[in-house]
């Protein structure tokens, strides 16, 4: 059967922003630069970001992903993923005589620092997040004696604190904004003196991607979210789409996972992607839809993003030293080829 022609009634609403956030971009580039700088293999503790395509691409270039620090042979380089790690992991790396590169997203590092500061002031810290997620494990490890995990409003009833006047909430950076505030409201009902973090812990990229989906959800009968099933922020986009009024929303890693029956009775399809997703995967989804008559694409713009994070300091240091060495070999700064 040949490709369908575009129908005036069929269209795609394409979310903007979508895909890579600054923290993911930094982490992926860090692995690529480390492979260039040190050669393969470069070990990465946990998936650098939660995206199957990205991980497979980096594996082909020589990255080796491990779940435990002890899996890295002594004397090698290990990079910590964008989700962050607990202090005990740094200690494990030191015992294993491993050189470390910390690719933790700076916005996650901010939450870690808040946890340490409030723990030092002897606050009970209520961490809103999903049990077992790597980011939550890392943040909890910063102050294990002070942090309690609150996995949604239904967890609030069982929360106990030592002093109701010294309680603060923090959150995983990739949650649904609405769901988090529902949990915060429930916590405030129980602990009226609950303190909020100095600034919102849910990252700008998570909020912007959810806002774009909210704007398209009322018009799109179907929303396709490109992202992996272990990606918290991608799964939240599916939930947000349904809450915004979309009849159906699905998470796919690749275009070939889309079921044609999803298009039955659909004239408007919303398309977005999680913060760990390269745009090439979205382009493949758009091509798939175009071949089925959904050729008209409208951008739904919720925000501008211009944030860029610098590479991990360990990598910047070694790149600077290499550049200085090359200059010295060529007879001094700025004189080569003069």
Curated annotation (Swiss-Prot):
Q: Which residues bind [4Fe-4S] cluster?
A: 21, 105, 203
Q: Which co-factor is required?
A: [4Fe-4S] cluster
Q: Where is the active site?
A: 135 (proton donor)
Could you tell me which Gene3D superfamilies the record lists for this protein?
3.40.50.11270, 4-hydroxy-3-methylbut-2-enyl diphosphate reductase, catalytic domain
Reactions the enzyme catalyzes: isopentenyl diphosphate + 2 oxidized [2Fe-2S]-[ferredoxin] + H2O = (2E)-4-hydroxy-3-methylbut-2-enyl diphosphate + 2 reduced [2Fe-2S]-[ferredoxin] + 2 H(+); dimethylallyl diphosphate + 2 oxidized [2Fe-2S]-[ferredoxin] + H2O = (2E)-4-hydroxy-3-methylbut-2-enyl diphosphate + 2 reduced [2Fe-2S]-[ferredoxin] + 2 H(+)
Catalytic EC class: oxidoreductase
Question: Which residues does the record give as (2E)-4-hydroxy-3-methylbut-2-enyl diphosphate binding sites?
Answer: 50, 83, 133, 173, 231-233, 276
> What is a biological process (GO) this protein takes part in?
terpenoid biosynthetic process
User: How is the cofactor bound here?
Assistant: Binds 1 [4Fe-4S] cluster per subunit.
Entry's Gene Ontology cellular component terms = cytosol
Query: PANTHER family this protein is in?
Result: 4-HYDROXY-3-METHYLBUT-2-ENYL DIPHOSPHATE REDUCTASE
Q: What is this protein called?
A: 4-hydroxy-3-methylbut-2-enyl diphosphate reductase
Identify the species of origin.
Answer: Streptomyces coelicolor (strain ATCC BAA-471 / A3(2) / M145)
Q: What are the leading ranks of the lineage?
A: Bacteria, Bacillati, Actinomycetota, Actinomycetes, Kitasatosporales
